[in-house]
Amino acid sequence: MAKKVIGFIKLQIPAGAANPAPPVGPALGQKGVNIMEFCKQFNAKTQSEAGMIIPVVITVFSDKSFTFITKTPPAAVLLLKEAKLQKGSGEPNRNKVGTVTREQVKKIAELKMPDLNAFDLRGAEEMIMGTARSMGIVVEG
């Protein structure tokens, strides 16, 4: 018989740096999950992507066991990395803070494709360009 799901927990955690401190500890503690076990598994799985923010969806079962799925880093984080910026513009309509090329947008779209609800690469590129626009990043090309 299948285990009964008692909840989902969605978090964004730096790759390879999960620890029991907030926000991880309290979120998992509420559901009774073994926090250290999750941290060990997550850090081992995301070791290669160190420095990136990784969204994770944790499924908690009635016997306090869990599984988790890691997703691709948020488009905003990838855009900031490509544009070599610390943060986006506070006023994206007025102040442009950086630029990315069409090639960089395509690279990000290819990486994000599994997590986006786009039918083709062109649609995914449009989504990434919209994110860039809302951050005050100009897309050239």
Curated annotation (Swiss-Prot):
Keywords, alphabetical: Methylation, Ribonucleoprotein, Ribosomal protein, RNA-binding, rRNA-binding
Post-translational modification: One or more lysine residues are methylated.
SUPFAM superfamilies documented for this protein: Ribosomal L11/L12e N-terminal domain, Ribosomal protein L11, C-terminal domain
GO molecular function, one term: structural constituent of ribosome
Name of the molecule in the record: Large ribosomal subunit protein uL11
Gene name of the record: rplK
InterPro entries hit by this protein: Ribosomal_uL11, Ribosomal_uL11_bac-typ, Ribosomal_uL11_C, Ribosomal_uL11_C_sf, Ribosomal_uL11_N, Ribosomal_uL11_N_sf
Record-linked PANTHER family: 60S RIBOSOMAL PROTEIN L12, LARGE RIBOSOMAL SUBUNIT PROTEIN UL11M
Subunit architecture: Part of the ribosomal stalk of the 50S ribosomal subunit. Interacts with L10 and the large rRNA to form the base of the stalk. L10 forms an elongated spine to which L12 dimers bind in a sequential fashion forming a multimeric L10(L12)X complex.
Gene Ontology terms describing biological process: translation
Role played: Forms part of the ribosomal stalk which helps the ribosome interact with GTP-bound translation factors.
Gene Ontology CC: cytosolic large ribosomal subunit
Family statement drawn from the similarity comment of this UniProt entry: Belongs to the universal ribosomal protein uL11 family.
